[in-house]
Regions:
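Divalent metal-binding pocket/active-site signature
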Residues: 1-40, 52-53, 60, 65, ...
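Hydrophobic faces of well-ordered beta-strands that scaffold small-molecule active sites
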Residues: 22-24, 44-46, 70-74
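Active-site micro-motifs of SAM-dependent methyltransferase domains
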Residues: 44, 78, 122
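Short glycine-rich anion-binding loops that position phosphate/pyrophosphate groups of nucleotides
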Residues: 49-50, 77
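Active-site phosphate/pyrophosphate- and oxyanion-stabilizing loops and adjacent acidic/basic residues
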Residues: 59-60, 99
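A general structural signal for short secondary-structure boundary/capping elements
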Residues: 67-75, 115-122
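Short acidic/histidine-rich active-site segments
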Residues: 68-90
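Mid-to-C-terminal alpha-helical segments outside catalytic/metal-binding sites
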Residues: 92-127
Length: 127
């Protein structure tokens, strides 16, 4: 999706009716892209990028994403969150990503865990 937000919106808009759920993997989009995806009820996976020192713009954008559409990922073995940069990313670092999101959103960590678990179930239609 890098440098292809307009193309992606055009494609998603064209096929939205045929898709049950849309996941924007490893979301790093602009505010405009986020706004368009919100209109299409997309889900967003957030990775270790939200912990990076130079990700202030992304952190501001994700504040506008609805919590009921957020899931978390490590994207292992890549995108290791701070303070573990330089190491191979592992699933155990998911906790670091969720804790950072909790701080960004000033939201209770337990609520985020509960909501994101529910989101996984809805997104992947796990009952």
């Amino acid at each position: 999706m890098r440098d292809a937000e307009e193309d992606m919106i055009d494609i998603l808009s064209k096929y939205r009716a045929k898709l049950s759920n849309i996941l924007i993997h490893c979301f790093t989009g602009s505010q405009n892209f986020a706004n368009q995806c919100i209109k299409m009820d997309c889900y967003y996976s957030l990775s270790g990028i939200i912990t990076f020192k130079n990700a202030d713009i992304l952190r501001n954008v994700i504040k506008t994403l609805p919590l009921n559409r957020i899931i978390f990922e490590t994207d292992s073995p890549y995108l290791t969150p701070d303070p573990f940069r330089g190491k191979t990313n592992e699933p155990k670092y998911l906790k670091t990503i969720i804790e950072k999101y909790s701080k960004i959103m000033s939201t209770d960590l337990e609520n985020i865990k509960k909501e994101s678990t529910s989101n996984y179930k809805k997104l992947f239609q796990i009952f």
